[in-house]
Each structure stands twice: as C-alpha cells, then as structure tokens.
Amino acid sequence: MMKLAKILLLFFCLLGQQTTKAQKMYQWELFPSYHNALKTVCSKEKVYALCNGNLLSYKTADQEVYRYDKTNLLNGFKISFIKYNKTVDKLIIVYADGNIDLMTDNETVVNIPQYKNKLINNKEIYGVNITGKYAYLATGFGIVVLDMQQNIIENTYILDFKVNATAIYNNKVYAATERGIYFAELDKNLMDKKSWQNLSGHYFTELMVFDNILFGNNTRASLFVLNEKNKTFDATDFKLINAWQITDGMMMAANSQNIYIFKNANEWNTIKQNNALQDIDYKNGVFWGASGYEGLKPYRINSDNQMEAVGEAIIPNSPVRDYANFINFAGNRLLVVGGNLNYNGVNYEGTVMYYDDNKWTNFQDGQAISDKTGLPYINTVNIAQDPRDENHHFVTSARLGMYEFLNGEMVRHYTCDNSRINSILPFDVERKKYVSTSGAMYDNQNNMWFINNQVDTIINVIKADGSWVKIYDEKIKGYPTFDFIMMDRKGRVWLNSRRHSQGIYMLDFNGTIEDTSDDESYFRASITNQDGKTYAPFGFYCMTEDQNGEIWIGTDVGLFVISNPDEFKNNNFVYTQIKVPRNDGTNYADYLLNNTNVTCIAVDGANRKWIGTTNGVYLVSADGMETIHHFTMENSPLISNSINSIAINHDNGQVMIATDKGLVAYNNDAAKPQESMEKSNVKAYPNPVKPEYNGYITIKGLTQNSCVKITSSNGQLIHEGVSNGGIYTWNGRNKQGKRVASGAYSVMATTENGKESVVTKIIIIR
C-alpha cells in the first residue's frame, strides 16, 4: 500500500511538472490541406467534404470534425471522387491511382484494390454513378461495376475508349464518352461491344436521372434532357452548371449566379447566390456547399430568396495547399514554400506558410498579392526568416522578383524597376516577368544573401543595416539555374547550379562582403571520385554540411561528399564516393546510391543522413556505410516517392518530408545533442506512462553518445544503451523483452567521457 502511495505521489508531482508534448516515436504524421473544398456529400450522420483531394467529415449532431488520411483509416491519398450510397449506407472513396475504399459512418473501411492493380496504363476514374447497391465507374476504357454491398467488382465492360459518366435509365446503361453518348440494354451481354449503340454526338461530363428523365451536363454549355422520341438531347436554359446533385427527391443545379432547386423536371425555384459553390448537397433543412477556399459551409434560404450562411465555415487548420517544394526550420518553426524554378513550364500558385506549436499559419495569398503588384503571384521557391524578428521574411520566386513579408502580409515586392535586382530581359516591356531569384539565407551577422539568376551578378546581399551589396564573379556570370545558397562553418558560401551550366560553386569572401579584392572562388562542373572515375551530372540538386564539416552533394547520378572543403580549390581535388562493402567474401564494394537521383539531404542530431530521392527516403549512418531505413510509398505512410526537400527539428528530432503530393512527418529518434548534461534539460515522455500506452518512451536533452541506464526502485538494471544525438528511446521492456511492472524507474544518463551525469524518473502505471 505504501509503495502504491509513493507511486501516486510521484505521478501527481510529475503531472504538475510535465510540459513536454508527448511525441510518438517512430510514428508518421501527415499534413494534408483542407482549404479548397470541391465536393460534398451527406450521409445519415455526417457531411463529408473533399478538399484538395483530402477527406474530412463533419458530424452534425456534436459538431465534430474528423480528418482522414493514410495514417488512420484510408488506404491511399489524393482522392478524385466521393459518393454516398444510401441503399447500403457506405461512402465510396475513389483515388487518383484507381484504388477504392468503402467506408461506413461508423468508420469501418474495406479496401478494393483490384482495379488499381490491373495491368493497364490509364487507371483514372472519371465519374461515379450510384444506382441501388451498385457503383458504376467511368474509366479510360469503359465501365466497371462495383457491388457496394458485397464489396466486390462484379463486372467490367470494355468499350476501348474513355467514358466520362454513366447512368441507368429505362433498363438501359448510358455512357457519356469522348465519342458521344452510347447505350446498351441491361438484359444484353454488355461485355460484347456489339451490344453498345451510339445515340448522339453530344459531349457530357455528367449524367443523372431525375423525375424519370435523363439529364446530361456539359459544364461549359448547358444542362440537356434526353428526347427519347427523337433519340437526341435537347438543351435547357440552365447554363454553365458546375455543381449538380440529386437528393431527398429534389435536384439542385448551381452556377456562379444561381442555384436551381427542382421539385420535378418542370418546376423549380431560382435562388440568387454569389458563393461560387463547387458542389452542393442537402440534409435536414440545411444546404451544404463546397465553397472552394471558403471551405465547407452550411446555408439556408432566407426571406429574400437568397442563400445565406448559417454557421462558421469548416476549414481545419492545415496548409493552404499541398505544395511543398522547399522546407527549412528556423528554430522550432517549419518554413514552407511551394513552387519551383519552372523548368517544366508548370506554374504553381504562390504558397508561403509555416508550422509552429502545432499550428499552421498561411501567408497572404494569391489574388491579394497580384492586386498589389499587378503581376502573377506564382512559383515561390525559397524563404529566409529574419533572426531579429520572427515575423519578418523574404521569399524568392522563379520569375517575379522577391517578396518581403511582415506578419504574413506582403510589405514590399522587389523588382528590376524598384531595386538592385536585375531582369533577364532588361529592355523588354515585360521585363518584370523575367526576374529570377532563388536561394535565400541569413548569415550570423544578420545579412540576407540571395541569388539573382541569369544576370551578370548572381550573388546579392542585403546587409543588416539595409544597404545592398552585389558580389560579381566572371566565372558564373549569366548562369541560369543556381538553386540554393549556404554558408559553411568557416564562413564560405556554397551554391549549387542545378542544371544548364550545372555544378558546385564556392566563394571564400574572407569575411569582407564589400571588399572583393581578397575573394577566392571556384566552380566545378564535373565530378571525379577517389577512384579516378569521372561523372558529368545533368543535375546538381542539393548540398548540406554535416556535423564533421563535410559537405554532402546530391546529383542525378548519385551521392558525393566533399570530405575536406579546404581542398575544393586544389587542382587535384576529388570527391569522395562512399563505398559500401558487399560482405559476401568477394572484397567488392558498391557506391552508395550510385545512379540514384538524390534530390535533398538533411543531417539529424546523430549526424545520420536523411536522403531524399525520386524513390523515397533513405536514412543512412553518419558515415554512410549502413542503410538504416528506406521508406517508400509501398512500405510506409509516405504519400509519394518523389521527395523535394527534408528538414529536421533538432529540438525533438522530427523529420519533415516535402513531397510532390504534400507534407509528411516522421518522429525520429535523434535530436541535436546538448553541450553539457543539465538536469533541467533532461526530460522523459510520456511520463507518467499510462496503462493503454504501448509505444516508446523518449528521453531527450542528452549529450552526444550519452550512456543511459534504467533501473528499478530496488536498483536492478532493466535496460541500457547509447543515445542518438540528444535522444534515447526505451520500449518499456526489460532485457528479456517483457513489459516492466508498475513502478518508479530511475534513468541515469552519463556523458561519453563519464564526467557528468543526471538522474530522472519515469513512472509506469499498468
């Protein structure tokens, strides 16, 4: 009894002191965007919304919002369609890759991967029609019939051309295709192409049956109705319909000005609206609108016969978009920009945001900035946070100059006409659309460095006092694709030229920004390794300095290391290409990640390397000799194998991964080590450990390679090991692999040299 009382006393003492957020070690977290609501459907208990291809639900009874992703219930990502089948009370979730989930309101999910796994090139599904217990899927080759009650694919009808939509009407299957409208009798052999007849040449993206009439919709034209007598479709006066739904015995059709609510095919009410609804549904007297970036909104018809919002928009705190091309930590704040240098001609909406204290803050966006500048706001590529003011940021862009933000609002747009930035086409009337800026960083003197591409002077510095310095170097004059800029521990500046005049550039300015007379610089376009093997990479994609001062380089032909940056200027300089022994008795070794497209590299608290590629993420040991993990879409919750950027929170070890589909986090077991062992820094979490918890217990705030011993209250050694950087993890088990009993356990952490140690307590309750 006394022992239990002591444990409870320690429990309440620790509860009062506990300030560290419990982070589940080795777990994944996704950060989907829920800002752009495009589709909505209602079930008996919930309203579902599809936002940027991500799913959420709103439970009207208790106003609970639930987010679904690959780490909880779903079996995929990037959803194309959702439809609710009231006959079987299931939601069908169709993914962009052809995968299918069926989900009930009580959140039981059945995955149907058969269509995704078919050996066909185009697996996209273009439309879903619900009739009875069936879902008819319009595909790139025909129609797939899914029995939603039995959770099986029942039939496949191959037409050999793209189908946009389907409908069942008067014992016939209708298909809106790229070649017009086709139909077939339901009692015929629908797998026989001869059973299908062409009805008309109309092009529709949607088909629906209402009031025993078949409707077709072309969002660029009008709603049409089938004239069976003439075997054609007749246009109606309802034009540019972009939201269309049938529910509770009524049909709703909306464009940018009106919502038409049909009681039957010949009787309707016209509701004025200016909400730009993307989709609409109805439940218990409330219209639910997918209102784009205004979120999921509830509406009612007011006395003026207008749609009026009757509640707050449902927009969970999240990134504004699933764009994450470059990420970086400033302290514990994750900075994110979406966009790229536009090599492939794709323009991404300007996207700048940060994640801090479990909350997303999205900067001023889109049209508001374009209205101020008179220019498009696209392809933001890099960001630097002012060390003197965490609310002050500079953001570079691929072609439209540089933006300065204060408290998330743009306060200045730097162009070739109002600053010392230069244009690629200085004499062109459209010169402000050809101002290429990239890589941005602050040095330890609060000077902001950035790149101005494809002009005579590439390197620019806005000094701490606001004055501007341009550092000219003939070697790199006019180079078009410098990407990132970084400063090593000796104050040298490094740039990677991604492609077109690609290579690695180093500038040693000897600490004198304005005096270029003592500068030394070097540019290397090719790579020769320690074995004399020479490479000419098409792309130099990334560079990072590790804890030993080595610089790791990622290219399209693999991974290389500048082992001693002091030697980069030497004529006989060679890169190190890490060789991993095969250990098969042959004495042979293989180059680490040879011929792998290495896109980004980050260094964790244990000096291990997190390497992003076009085939997932690798975690390798500090020296690269051991591959600890290779995470892919196939073996983890990673949402894409195409990795853009990786950043690590050195306080808690969390690894943030930016992919071409959005952001993912992995709770890593290595954080930046402390300089000295201080009791105030050493914390364990979760603490206390409650009965339902089965995960790892984390001890943080340690020095490099700390020796950790965990003992019971009677002094028995339960567990021991060495920290990864500043973190040590324990699975709550003894040396025999059994879960330890309730009690107070002592954690003794000692520095690598044995001179300093601290003791903390962990309370475990079983």
Report residues per predicted region.
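Bacterial Sec-dependent N-terminal signal peptides
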Residues: 1-27, 766
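Carboxylate-rich, polar loop motifs that coordinate divalent cations or form catalytic acidic clusters
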Residues: 22-682, 717
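Short, surface-exposed loop/turn motifs with a glycine/proline- and acidic-biased composition
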Residues: 70, 723-754
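Residue-level recognition of strand-loop junctions within catalytic nucleotide-signaling folds
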Residues: 668, 700-702, 750
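Glycine-centered coil/turn sites that cap beta-strands in beta-rich domains
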Residues: 676-709, 727-730
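Short, glycine-anchored, charge-dense loop/turn motifs used at functional sites
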Residues: 707-718, 745
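Edge beta-strands of extracellular beta-sandwich domains
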Residues: 757-762
